[in-house]
Regions:
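Intrinsically disordered, low-complexity regulatory segments
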Residues: 49-51
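N-terminal intrinsically disordered, low-complexity, charge/repeat-rich segments that act as generic
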Residues: 53-55
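Short, structured interface segments
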Residues: 71-100
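Flexible glycine-rich surface loops and low-complexity tracts that mediate binding to linear polymers
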Residues: 65-79, 167-180
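Generic beta-strand structural signal
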Residues: 66, 83-85, 106, 131
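Acidic, gly/ser/pro-rich intrinsically disordered tails
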Residues: 1-5, 9, 16-26, 37-44, ...
């Protein structure tokens, strides 16, 4: 599971439409695009699906081409080897001027499994101890599992048994996004790490391994 509390600003690419949930409640849905430039100079135009309380009348305010700022809960998952970002908000959606900069900032809550490479200890250029590790979250799509990887940087090294290769962890930290060769890279600056105690359902999913 990868869940983030974020604020993002971008351009609406498909006008809002009224929809009805399984519970019969009306809401609006639209897509927006936020561009990200990576350290390697490549750019990724990332599309985000947004859902918010509303109806056909309020949907008319959010037409394609308008720049908006949305705050809410962002869910990140893989499907058909593509990374999808779905943002749910209960807050007011702010309509912005064209000069308002693109952005996506916030915090991340991650539950998943540390890679077989484990945790690397190293020193920064200023000699400060740090750690880095990668971990994945798995999602089941029909009969197949897909894996979303996150790269973590920990500025306060932890040397506990639960922070090691093939261990399940729950991580909270600052969401950071990068682009490498035109593909979105998920990163997180760690604030806290704890062992993730799996229930039977989560355990069955988490036992799946990327090939």
């Amino acid at each position: 599971m990868i869940k983030c509390n974020v604020t993002t600003c971008g351009v609406i690419t498909s006008s809002a439409e009224e929809k009805t949930s399984k519970e019969g409640e009306k809401f609006i849905s639209f897509s927006m695009m936020v561009p990200f430039e990576g350290k390697d100079g490549t750019v990724k135009e990332q599309y985000i699906s947004v859902s918010a309380p509303g109806n056909a009348q309020s949907a008319a305010n959010y037409s394609a081409g308008r720049r908006v700022t949305v705050s809410g809960v962002l869910y990140i998952r893989k499907h058909d080897n593509n990374t999808y970002l779905n943002l749910r908000t209960d807050a007011n959606i702010e309509i912005n001027d064209s000069t308002t900069p693109d952005r996506l900032v916030g915090s991340m809550e991650f539950r998943g499994k540390i890679s077989k490479k484990g945790v690397k200890d190293f020193n920064s250029k200023k000699g400060k101890p740090m750690q880095s590790f990668s971990a994945f979250s798995s999602d089941k799509n029909v009969e197949n599992y897909e894996f979303t990887w996150v790269s973590f940087i920990n500025l306060s090294p932890i040397h506990e048994e639960y922070l090691a290769a093939d261990k399940y962890v729950e991580v909270h930290g600052d969401l950071q996004l990068d682009v490498f060769k035109g593909e979105l890279q998920l990163e997180c600056k760690v604030n806290s790490v704890a062992p993730w105690e799996l229930n039977k359902t989560a355990g069955a999913n988490a036992e799946q391994q990327p090939s």
